[in-house]
Each structure stands twice: as structure tokens, then as C-alpha cells.
Amino acid sequence: MESEFQQHHFLLHDHQHQRPRNSGLIRYQSAPSSYFSSFGESIEEFLDRPTSPETERILSGFLQTTDTSDNVDSFLHHTFNSDGTEKKPPEVKTEDEDAEIPVTATATAMEVVVSGDGEISVNPEVSIGYVASVSRNKRPREKDDRTPVNNLARHNSSPAGLFSSIDVETAYAAVMKSMGGFGGSNVMSTSNTEASSLTPRSKLLPPTSRAMSPISEVDVKPGFSSRLPPRTLSGGFNRSFGNEGSASSKLTALARTQSGGLDQYKTKDEDSASRRPPLAHHMSLPKSLSDIEQLLSDSIPCKIRAKRGCATHPRSIAERVRRTKISERMRKLQDLVPNMDTQTNTADMLDLAVQYIKDLQEQVKALEESRARCRCSSA
């Protein structure tokens, strides 16, 4: 078949190169009509060809499991004899015989449909290929009324009751184990001895999921227990991590080692020191004012970030001081010069002050001259 396709391809390629270039109507990159006619004849020859017995046997085995399937394992683990022949399923009486059903001769794609009550059916879909007719016996309908089969396919999915038994703490314990443990291996090992008695039998996994890896279940109880073996939970987390007794002792020891020379800031009240919370604030400030002053005297002042608009450069600081002095002197000048508007700018204020000073100087000069000319008569 492939050789015929290649031959037609070469003929088409030669035909396109041998056509005259200056013809009126040119069929660009199109095949001649003779090519498609010969192609149809080759398809008819293939359709008339009967399928092999091995293909018919495999297809009939798939189609017989379409309507009813009581067990998932009977479908997944399809058994064959030692000589390669399929083990025949139990015979069932049929009503309509020799029903012609078109199936694929090359390949089929199976669709596994799982209904709500656990029924599983297989629907072979016709894939790319040529269609051949295969006769099979039609399965009779069952007498009991079952729910309609759902069209949603669940490929490689887990059983319906699997995810309801998964516990968040189990997944967390597995993650902690993969991270190398969280310091709770001893507690896990001792608590696993009572796991088998505390785990209910009703939560065990269904038999259809035995091929998958088992997922453990953890009962939420004060004493952490699980039915996993000790080696599985050896790296799990410790349930007593939030216990204030062990945590406070560790934090207190850590505070003692890190505090160092801060013992001088301890208060004199022994009762209040004994009633401290579990978390020791060893880096907190002392409570008394004298201790705070001593701490501030020993500490080195750190650089504080300048406010917005306040630069820390020496020239900027000098300019800011100069402007501050000018502002103070202008306020004094406003007090000395009468009828000076405070909203006037600095230049106008200076002009008014200069004019006022000149007027004062003229008045002083006139008074001095009048005093010099004045003669007091002696009595």
C-alpha cells in the first residue's frame, strides 16, 4: 500500500515538472484527477480484504465486555492461555444474533466508563483506519433496572472511597519524613504500638486498590497514633511540639547562653522573676529607669535617618543655620519698625527698615543742631 502511495507521489511530482510554464490556466500544487481515481481503487481493494483471525479475536474479546462488568480485576487483568489464545468468558444466551457492528481494522481506542454504583463498561471508539464489519452476538439486557451509565471516563483513576480516608496529618507526616525528620522519631516509634487496635476496620482500603501503594490514615486523638509501621513514621513530626513544658525549658536554656552580660539588668524581685512566661525575652529593655540610663550610656548612638528636607551635609547644615538667624533678626526688625506688614517679603522689609533708620538719623541731626544753637539764660 505504501509503495503505491509513493509511486503516485513520484508520478505527480514528474507531472508537475513536465507541464508547460506558459499555459493559460495553471493548477498550482494540485494533483491530477487520475491520481485520485487510482487512489479510490486502492481503497476499495483494501476494504474488500478480510481481516486476520487474530484481529477479530482480540476485537471480539473487547466488545464482549462492553455491557456488563461485575469486577474491575476481571477487566484489567485480561487472562490468556499459554498458547496465546484468550480464555473464553462464560456464555450468555442472546436474543439477536449475527448483529453486524463496524469496528476498526487497524487500531481501537477504549473508553472506560464508571457509573455511580460501581459499574464499568468499555466503549471502543473507531480510530484512524479503515472500517471492517465483524459479526458478534449481541448481549441481552439485564432484567434488573440499573442506573444509566455515566459518559464521563475515569482513566487511571482511584476508587471512589479512597480520598475520603486520607488525612491531612498523614500527608504532613510524609512530607516531614521526606525533609529528614522534625525531631519526633522517638514519639512516633512508641505511639505506633497501639496503632492496630485504634484504627477501625471500616476505614481500610477497598480490595480494588490493592495494586496501588497504600495510603495511611491517622486518627486525630490526644496520643498520636497511626497504623503505619515505625519505619514509616520515624521521621515524622512531633505532636508535643506545642507543649510549653519542653519548649520553655529549651528556650530558657537558650536565653541563658545568649544573654551573657545582661545579668545586671535582672530585677531584684525574685517572685516576679520566677513567674515569667515560658518565652524569655532576654533581649528586652530593663524595667527600672536607672538600668535604662546605664544601658543608654554604654550604648553607641546610631545614625538616625534625616527627616524629609533636612540634609546632613555640613554645607547644608550651615546654610540652614544662616537662614534661621536671618529669620530671627527679621522678626526683631519687624518689632522695631512701625507699620511693617508681616506678609511683605524680606527685600521690601529691609528697604523699609533702611528708610526708617535714615529718617531717624535726620531727626537726631536736627535735634543736635537745635541744641547747639540753644542758649539758656542765666537767672
From Swiss-Prot:
Region (Disordered): 1-21, 79-98, 133-156, 190-286
Cellular component aspect of the GO annotation: nucleus
Keywords, alphabetical: DNA-binding, Nucleus, Phosphoprotein, Transcription, Transcription regulation
SMART domains assigned to the protein according to its UniProt record, in alphabetical order: HLH
Domain bHLH: 310-360
Disulfide bridge positions per record: none
Biased composition range(s): Basic and acidic residues: 1-17, 84-93, 265-274
Subcellular location per the Swiss-Prot or TrEMBL entry: Nucleus
Official protein name in the record: Transcription factor bHLH122
Organism per entry: Arabidopsis thaliana
Gene name in the database record: BHLH122
